[in-house]
């Protein structure tokens, strides 16, 4: 019962995150679409790649899709997200708990009638689902003598530097959605992609939107 309650809470967290992300697109302006500097190591290698990928209709895969700002923004967002994942930004990992879930608890099945066909779930051949975290190791205990004072050791939680929290993931994806629309609106000055000078515009526009000048704790935009 406790496991099912944790599962339900986790599902509601993801639903709330998706709603917050979609609402945030309309609330953020270009100057507010700011991402923490510690995520810059994921952003920097990808902006130039995305600018090159979406600057021509042949690389986008659909010429009809790229004839308007919405199609260009979609290309920018999808390409940016794929590039971030390729560079190690785990956007969808959470650190809720190391939860072991049996398939029979999530999808309860009635017993098959005698002589009926059995599935793998009936034979318990399916491995349990799990949200895996890095292994937790306790620090070594100090050697105590007969006159040593009592020492309480508080272990530190494991650190996963490449895993983004749920809040960081929402912040990053909301900023990317906002900036891809801003960049598409800024750079698509001609009737379509083929006649627009996108390659020289996409990269600096994305960088300026994600890291605007004067942002608190921020840094100047990346030069192309």
From Swiss-Prot:
GO terms for biological process: nodulation. Residues 1-20 form the signal peptide. Residues 103-124 are annotated as: Disordered. InterPro entries: Nodulin. It comes from the Eukaryota. Keywords: Nodulation, Signal. Belongs to the nodulin 20 family. Involved in the infection process during the plant-rhizobium interaction. This is Nodulin-C51. It comes from Glycine max.
């Amino acid at each position: 019962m406790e496991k099912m309650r944790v599962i339900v809470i986790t599902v509601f967290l993801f639903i709330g995150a998706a709603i917050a992300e979609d609402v945030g697109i309309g609330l953020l302006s270009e100057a507010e679409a700011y991402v923490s500097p510690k995520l810059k190591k994921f952003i920097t290698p990808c902006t130039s790649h995305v600018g090159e990928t979406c600057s021509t209709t042949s690389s986008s895969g659909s010429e009809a899709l790229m004839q308007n700002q919405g199609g260009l923004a979609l290309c920018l967002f999808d390409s940016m997200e794929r590039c971030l994942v390729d560079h190690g930004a785990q956007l969808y990992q959470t650190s809720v708990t190391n939860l072991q879930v049996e398939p029979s608890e999530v999808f309860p099945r009635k017993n098959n009638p005698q002589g009926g066909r059995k599935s793998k779930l009936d034979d318990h051949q399916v491995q349990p689902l799990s949200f895996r975290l890095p292994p937790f190791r306790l620090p070594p205990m100090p050697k105590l003598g007969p006159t040593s004072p009592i020492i309480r050791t508080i272990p530190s939680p494991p650190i996963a530097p490449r895993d983004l929290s749920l809040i960081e993931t929402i912040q990053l994806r909301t900023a990317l959605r906002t900036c891809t629309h801003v960049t598409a609106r800024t750079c698509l000055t001609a009737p379509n992609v083929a006649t627009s000078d996108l390659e020289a515009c996409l990269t600096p526009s994305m960088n300026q939107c994600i890291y605007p000048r004067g942002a608190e704790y921020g840094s100047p935009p990346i030069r192309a």
